[in-house]
Amino acid sequence: MPDHSQFNVEHTYPGMWTITFSNPPINMFVPTTIVELGTLMADLEADPCLKVVVFQSMNPDFFIAHLDVSKAAERPEVLGLWREFVLRLSSTRVVSIAKIRGRTRGIGNEFVLACDMRFASRQTAIFGNPEIGVGAGRRRAGMAPACGRPLAGTRDRAQRRRFRC
């Protein structure tokens, strides 16, 4: 498994990985993050023993801040890679869980919606869409439409019942 600069991968238990975002100071997604997530997705799909992956943040104030649009403009191909990653994550056999503490905005919202389950801290979780403030909806901004899945979609509810959460 390759080293990643934007997050740490820990094989927590047999069949379970914990991915910890660590891109200080605010866990902003940059093109490198998206490329590395694509590599991570290939690793997840290639491990037949993997059952669960938990995504969390090292920073208690930010889960995923947002996309650095100035850097993304330099590499427009990453938006296609992002769409591919979100769709693969939402349909993989591995159960994906977002453990949310702190702010989650823009691309971070799309990320957590692609996960099968999401658990947010009542004390610190804050969700926001900065695209709205600049008049750019997700589709016009070129971002993936959160897989068309509502926040509490049927797969999410089914997984919670399955695991008795």
Identify the meaning behind each predicted range.
Residues 28, 64, 107:
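Residues that form or flank phosphate/diphosphate-binding pockets in enzymes
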Residues 23-26, 69-70, 125:
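A short, flexible beta-alpha/helix-coil linker loop
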Residues 31-32, 67, 110, 139:
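Generic recognition of short, well-ordered alpha-helical segments
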Residues 90-165:
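Crotonase-fold acyl-CoA enzyme core
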Residues 35, 49, 57-88, 104:
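Glycine- (often His-adjacent) and acidic-residue-rich active-site loop
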Residues 40-43, 81-93:
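Catalytic-core regions built around general acid/base machinery
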Residues 19, 55, 68, 111-113:
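Hydrophobic/aromatic residues within transmembrane alpha-helices
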Residues 1-56, 60:
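Conserved CoA-thioester-binding segment of acyl-CoA-metabolizing enzymes
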